[in-house]
């Protein structure tokens, strides 16, 4: 990825009053200061930023890139306020674009946690007949099938048609299947869209073997992002056979692909009432009244210890407070390093344990905006410690921000806005005492790079039409003028 030297003139660093020049050479920040163009050499390119703000490029610390690419192509049912409303959206699509034989209508984005009516196969069947319809929830933890949709996915029958967690997740390989070439084109399009928002890298936690598809995509020219590819337990032996450790650059990918962490999902989600909690969900009884523990400690601890011995960090999905307690217990028992993904509901004691154990909290602030009403109903009396970002920061916990795309948009400015404002759509802030300050939110979005640009750092930069620290800066809609990866433009709009 060798590129000629590039001088960004009249650049403004975050929070700075005066402009400087930024010299990029050999894929890194070579110098920051005044009048650098004179000594940059005859072959150097110059681009006048005209006072625009330049900062390290943004990372999304939790994505599912194929799911995100698929969601961008699927029927959007996120606006549905009831099962009946979702069915009307489905019928409108079927009327406009009838299915061709052998295909299914797949929608994405419903959240039934507050619906007045239950999503069932019978309801869908009464409306769509023999049409295979599959609607995936916004949190990816369940799906709603018509009877024909069940048959399409290879399921003979189901009592309700609403499949959650372990019933649903094995079916994603069928429901999500499209030819590699099509999926790769959609992922490339999604990658370019991310670059247009200042993104230079993602942590890829797709539920599949992630190295092979990204090797293929990069070889085919998808070079808009750096990718840190997580590995799931079924594919762990393949990574270990290559003797890859977390942080290793994968050979033959132009420095774009790194081995990421071991990913383990230990509980469910709030919307499905499967996040594993110390206290039961209101109105639920029986074995799952506290949610679902997908991976018990007796399996989790040795798995994490094994990965640690082989040089992998661990990324442990935990949403409910009991799941978080057990995840932290597992970090302590295994000696593993890494992150808890989501960390949505925490006890006060566990906030402190994140800090003492050195466990990173990988959080998705926009989920608080999506889940606030569901949390008020299903975590009533506990929401003061839900999405407790300020408490974690005050305890000295390292935070990284992400989207969990497609659960939230792959746009770090959306995450920063949600973290700082705790509000959306003109509503009052939800638990404003848990807001992050803006500097912390920005620092949690740039993969550990200093906001003021460090000499020697990768030349992965975002060029903005507004300083995010300026009063009234439009955080959620931050205008991004350009993005550079290793000193080459992946997006330029000026």
Please provide the spans of the model-predicted regions.
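In a subset of proteins, long, contiguous C-terminal domains/tails are tracked
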Residues: 4-5, 9, 31, 51, ...
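His/Asp/Glu-enriched, well-ordered alpha-helical/loop segment
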Residues: 185, 304-315, 319-338, 342-343, ...
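Short, hinge-like loop/turn segments at secondary-structure boundaries
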Residues: 152, 220-222, 244-247, 332-334, ...
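Short aromatic-centered micro-motifs
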Residues: 22-23, 264, 483
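Extended hydrophobic/aromatic segments used for targeting, binding, or gating
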Residues: 216, 220-256, 260, 345-352, ...
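Conserved, mostly hydrophobic/aromatic
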Residues: 51, 146, 198, 259, ...
